């Protein structure tokens, strides 16, 4: 059974990376069960393996960390739920297919948002989860960037709950120029992080049996 582990206070990105990589090694060695970490980071810009330096516009004294996950620049900070599924795709009940895994992550988040009346969707060739705001313009509500080691997944998803969206102005999010970002709060949904986590766990079980 996959266990959900919540870090109750905001955590430094580097500290969470060490925690995550240590747990990945334990799963690979058969010393720990699969898990989903739920965290909230201190303000940080992270760059994936496909980043371009010109996509960092102005870091405004926010730390910048270059990571091994897929994707480009994104922001993590207060009011954002970051989800790190550490799953073993080599297990008999899973599939060694990274594209399928990402599609399952997308479905999980889309279904979770639907509980709140938010109709989210994916856009071809644009990684992440999108919604249409009042002006009918696509806005990203969740970013996805994953990595796999010996078929054990790590890194994951960042969903904007009550995030200060102005912090995204320092980057070109995910390398998509002129793209907009949004949050549950901006869409009129106000919910405690712990309540959102409960929905995530319920919907996770439906997708990752």
Swiss-Prot record:
Keywords: Acyltransferase, Cytoplasm, Transferase. Coiled coil: none annotated. GO terms for biological process: protein modification process. Its EC number is 2.3.1.181. InterPro entries: aa-tRNA-synth_II/BPL/LPL (IPR045864), BPL_LPL_catalytic (IPR004143), Octanoyltransferase (IPR000544), Octanoyltransferase_CS (IPR020605). It is an enzyme of class 2 (transferase). It holds the Pfam family LplA-B_cat. PROSITE patterns: BPL_LPL_CATALYTIC (PS51733), LIPB (PS01313). GO terms for molecular function: lipoyl(octanoyl) transferase activity. GO terms for cellular component: cytoplasm. Pathway: Protein modification; protein lipoylation via endogenous pathway; protein N(6)-(lipoyl)lysine from octanoyl-[acyl-carrier-protein]: step 1/2. It catalyses: octanoyl-[ACP] + L-lysyl-[protein] = N(6)-octanoyl-L-lysyl-[protein] + holo-[ACP] + H(+). Substrate binds at residues 69-76, 143-145, 156-158. The keyword Acyltransferase applies. The keyword Nucleotidyltransferase does not apply. It is found in: Cytoplasm. The record marks 140 as: Lowers pKa of active site Cys. Residues 30-209 form the BPL/LPL catalytic domain. NCBIfam families: lipB, PRK14341.1, PRK14345.1. In the reaction, the free carboxyl group of octanoic acid is attached via an amide linkage to the epsilon-amino group of a specific lysine residue of lipoyl domains of lipoate-dependent enzymes. Belongs to the LipB family. Catalyzes the transfer of endogenously produced octanoic acid from octanoyl-acyl-carrier-protein onto the lipoyl domains of lipoate-dependent enzymes. Lipoyl-ACP can also act as a substrate although octanoyl-ACP is likely to be the physiological substrate. This is Octanoyltransferase. It comes from Rickettsia bellii (strain OSU 85-389).
């Amino acid at each position: 059974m996959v266990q959900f582990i919540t870090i109750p206070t905001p955590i430094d990105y580097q500290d969470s990376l060490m925690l995550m990589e240590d747990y990945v090694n334990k799963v690979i060695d058969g010393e720990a069960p699969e898990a989903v970490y739920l965290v909230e980071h201190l303000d940080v810009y992270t760059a994936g393996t496909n980043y371009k330096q010109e996509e960092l516009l102005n870091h405004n004294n926010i730390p910048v960390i270059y990571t091994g996950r897929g994707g480009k620049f994104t922001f993590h900070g207060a009011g954002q739920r970051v989800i790190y599924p550490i799953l073993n795709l080599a297990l008999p009940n899973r599939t060694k297919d990274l594209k399928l895994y990402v599609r399952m992550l997308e479905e999980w988040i889309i279904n979770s948002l639907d509980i709140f009346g938010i109709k989210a969707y994916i856009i071809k060739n644009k990684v992440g989860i999108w919604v249409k705001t009042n002006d009918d313009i696509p806005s990203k509500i969740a970013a996805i960037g994953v990595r796999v080691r010996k078929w054990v997944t790590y890194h994951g998803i960042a969903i904007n709950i009550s995030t200060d969206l102005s912090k995204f102005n320092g980057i070109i999010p995910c390398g998509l120029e002129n793209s907009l970002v949004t949050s549950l709060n901006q869409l009129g949904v106000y919910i405690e992080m712990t309540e959102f986590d409960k929905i995530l766990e319920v919907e996770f079980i439906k997708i990752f049996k």
